[in-house]
Amino acid sequence: MTVTQVQSGVPNLTYQVSWEIPEDHSLLDEPVENTSQPLLAAALRESLELIGFLTPERLVASNLGICATVNGKTIVKASDWLYAPRVLPLDPPRARRSYTPRVEGDIPAVVMEFLSETDGGEYSARPFYPYGKFWFYERILQAPLYVILEPEGGTLEMRQLAEGIYQVQQPEANGRYWIASMALYLGVWHGTKAERTGYWLRWWDENENLLLWGIERLEQERQRAERLESYLRSQGIDPDEIP
């Protein structure tokens, strides 16, 4: 068990944080607040999977409870999306129902929230149990990057931990944010995927190439095949007769 003392920034308030979950603790499932949240999270994961970014040693998850014990009380906060660079792999067919940093792997390098139309808890800095999400990520978890997307208007905010406090970051000239721990850019893209039309979070590589979804790759291949067929016919070759 790892125990750390954390200064809260509030006078006379210190946290004792331990990274071990009691055996009898029952995880509470946080409901997904709207249909856009799982679609946004799945789209982020899909393009990473297609480039081979996902490995058993890396954790990319959505709506997964991040666990800590603070002053003897167990805290579970489910982020809409998270990335941890190194974790202890689970033996199949076990599924990960929660994640306890330091015990099961690294502190998440990136945590994300997609704003809902409810109480705006993603910005909550409540320093007392059960703690606001913003406060939990900044002071207790101390995740290096906290990303917030407002899906309706496409507003993207990124905060980086500096001396224990989140500082708002400015996008680069291309309008995107460089995430060094993933060697990728993160930005906003507007379009349609599945049944949803609107703003999406997308990845770009270091050369600013958009990481495509599966359906986009298929369309790219279809267009390439059409161009090849057109070229062959222009040369007097019938593609259907090529063995």
Model-derived segments and their meaning:
Residues 79, 143-145:
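Short, surface-exposed beta-edge/turn micro-motifs
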Residues 32-62, 69-82:
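Acidic-basic catalytic patches of nuclease active cores, encompassing PD-(D/E)XK
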